[in-house]
Amino acid sequence: MNGRPSQKGRSRKRAKRGFASWSPGKKAVAILMGVLILLITATVAVVAAKWGKIGGVALNPDKLAISEEAEISGTGYLTVALFGLDTRATDEEMGARSDTIMVASLNRETKEIKLVSVYRDTLLQLSDGAYNKANAAYAYGGEEEAVAMLNKNLDLNIEHYVSVDFSVLVHVIDALGGIDINVEEAENGIDIIPYLNNYVVEVIKNTGVDSAPFTQLGQQHLNGVQATAYARLRYGGGDDYKRTERQREVLEQIAIKAQKAKLSTINKIIDKVFDNVKTNFTLTETIAYAKDVKSYKFGETQGFPYESTTANLDVGDSVVATDLASD
């Protein structure tokens, strides 16, 4: 089988820390990616006027790999795939890898939302039967392939998606006046400031937005470039698990400030962001779900896979679920 784990794999069973143990307020992080906090804090009139800026393609239901069992078990739920895109190497969305993958499931009756973060290096099966890292599906077949991959491997009933280019973080954070982040020392003891500043240079190059470099660790106020660089950091220990925690931390702070932002600020953000958002939600659907936002509450959250082994495969270092059925 293409992508079969080697005997050099390293087993890992991770304690339920981070995402799984966060408070309800901290779990609001993923709302930014899912229903887009901007949509639910702005007025309906503003959103409706700007909706034409949003792109997206319809999904073919026959190609989404939704099983009969998943269709039945998914009755009464809205399950949405959330993609944060890495489009640095391409001008087109097709070919971009999904740097962040989340699944949000809304119980339509109780209004409870459950969130799952799928680690980008997780080995999963694509529609052609080949195995590859989870973040490769978007590059190979766009939203349709990525959604089908999640449905096929995790027995889900996903028909909707939201995709956001990570570059929009820079503009959103700057429009909100920056965010406060505690930049901690690396788990493995290395000096991460040079690595952070390498990412700062990269973000400046890709967005054209200037920024000062990092000069220290600890609690500090970050601008859009700095916060995006922090969210992308892959060094310092903790592998992709620690990186996804940093991304959630940044998104949490954005959500907190966006909820308190003035309408003029939200309008400014929408002008910057909507051009970089893709979804197959219609305006009518979005407004219908947004009107109940105050009733939404967060339930169980976790990362996938919970139990895993790491292995060096044909597709590179990968995270392999040791018990896909239980995960």
Please report, for each region that a protein language model flagged, where it lies by residue:
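Extracytoplasmic/secreted envelope proteins and their assembly/folding machinery
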Residues: T100, Y131, E143-N151, F166-V170, ...
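Structured segments of extracytoplasmic/periplasmic soluble domains
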Residues: F83, A89, E109, D121, ...
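C-terminal solvent-exposed extensions
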Residues: S67-A70, Y77, G95, L126, ...
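Second-shell loop/turn segments in exported
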Residues: A89-E92, N132-Y140, D155-H160, L217, ...
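Flexible, polar/acidic helix-loop-strand segments at domain edges
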Residues: D174-T265
